[in-house]
Regions:
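Positively charged n-region of N-terminal signal peptides that target proteins for export
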Residues: 1-4
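Bacterial N-terminal signal peptides
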Residues: 7-16
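Carbohydrate-interacting regions of secretory-pathway proteins
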Residues: 20-422
């Protein structure tokens, strides 16, 4: 009996110890701001460099600043894991610019490039992603002009400050979504990430860089979907900054020109779309509760197009969304696509939901106005001043807005959002 009791007692100790170990490894979800760098020491951090080198030569702390020489390659990481947070860091190049990165959801053993999702810190490339160690996410899976090798390029122009000036890099990690913001501008989005928690690393990768004011905070007040409080120009009249171009199987030709470059272009304040092959441009940002204004005209024989509201999931030709139809003579119809739903005339619909009145589109070559109101789950479509369709209980009710390529040449201009109360 005594031997049995002793064995049982030891088993309880082992189990308790195992539980404690698992508890220590459990990812922290911040409920308040957690300061990660105290400005004086490396408390709460683990340093790692290639070949087991002298970390004291790579990383130092002085005057409230965490300084990195950039050599040899490696990183400094949090000792603890985190999930569902916003990571905040201020940074500046201490001399010559170069390469760096923020690794989120780092798991596994310490090595120079551990399994993680890198939010690129390279000069003029901040906001790119690098997949490290087999991390999967939607935007990497679809390949195309933005996804080359392990890299997924940022949305558009950089938003970095001049070398020597302090910039702000924030990374929002919410569930399977990762969003990097550089000086307040959304630079990219990774969705359905295979990793949703882990340690956070600041890289040493080539050039001297300094960090300060490092913390994580709760992600309960995420900055998306954006609800307009003033007019938002979605199209700047000059280029497609703020938009993502999508064509399936997007490939470069012999002149290294990608398919999306042939389908979409901008001249004289107008977005031109060839209509073939099928695809769309979509806003980088997600929106909810707004008035959308779009002007369109057929540049050739009129065929088909549409405004896709609140695209959800992975980019594909017909994603989950509510389509405000632009097919010639059918503008104002709804098409509910990809598993989306909408209540129309009292019935939950999937597929087609016809407009109320005969077509009031203008002749091909003339500009038309599309005014769309999205208010919670309510959606109303007005063509050239005439209310053509209404629906309620839309799912999804927020997300990016897309303009389709689906048939023949079409043009768009004056694309903007306004608040509902205007």
């Amino acid at each position: 009996m005594k031997r049995t009791a002793l064995i049982l007692g030891m088993a309880c100790v082992v189990l308790a110890g195992g539980s404690a170990a698992r508890g220590e490894d459990k990812a922290i979800q911040p409920t308040e701001k957690i300061v990660l760098f105290d400005g004086k020491s490396f408390d709460g951090w683990v340093r790692h460099v290639r070949g087991g080198g002298d970390v004291e030569k790579t990383w130092t702390v002085k005057d409230g600043v965490l300084a990195c020489t950039g050599r040899p390659p490696g990183y400094i990481r949090t000792a603890k894991s985190y999930k569902n947070y916003v990571f905040h860091v201020e940074y500046r190049w201490a001399g010559k610019t170069g390469n760096n990165g923020i690794l989120v959801h780092m798991v596994g053993q310490d090595r120079v490039w551990p399994k993680s999702l890198e939010c690129q810190g390279m000069y003029r490339n901040q906001g790119d992603y690098f997949e490290i160690g087999g991390v999967e996410f939607n935007e990497h899976k679809i390949k195309g002009h933005r996804a080359r090798g392990r890299r997924v390029a940022k949305y558009g122009q950089h938003n970095e400050k001049k070398p020597g000036e302090w910039g702000v890099y924030e990374v929002w990690c919410v569930g399977g979504t990762v969003r990097p913001y550089v000086n307040g501008k959304l630079m990219n989005e990774a969705t359905d990430c295979s990793l949703t928690e882990g340690k956070i690393c600041l890289q040493s990768e080539g050039a001297p860089i300094e960090f300060r004011n490092i913390y994580v905070a709760p992600a309960d007040k995420k900055p998306w979907p954006v609800v307009p409080t003033k007019k938002i120009e979605l199209f700047n009249g000059k280029d497609l900054d703020g938009w993502v171009r999508f064509i399936p199987n997007d490939k470069p030709d012999k002149d290294k020109k990608w398919t999306v470059d042939k389908v979409w272009s901008v001249t004289d304040g107008v977005i031109h779309c060839t209509g073939k092959p099928h695809g769309y441009i979509r806003t980088c940002e997600s929106y909810a509760n707004y008035k959308l204004h779009v002007e369109w005209r057929w540049a050739d024989k009129p065929t088909n197009s549409g405004v896709l509201l609140h695209r959800a999931g992975i980019d594909r030709v017909w994603p989950k969304c509510v389509e405000a139809q632009l097919m010639h003579q059918n503008a104002g119809d709804f098409w509910i696509i990809g598993g989306a739903t909408l209540k129309h005339a009292g019935t939950v619909k999937k597929g087609h939901a016809a407009k109320k009145n005969p077509s009031n589109e203008k002749a091909p070559g003339q500009w038309n106005n599309y005014d769309i109101v999205c208010d919670g789950g309510k959606v109303a479509l007005t063509i050239n001043g005439l209310l053509q369709n209404e629906g309620t209980d839309a799912d999804p009710s927020s997300g990016p807005i897309c303009l389709q390529s689906e048939g023949s040449a079409i043009e768009f201009r004056n694309v903007y959002l306004e608040p509902l109360d205007k």
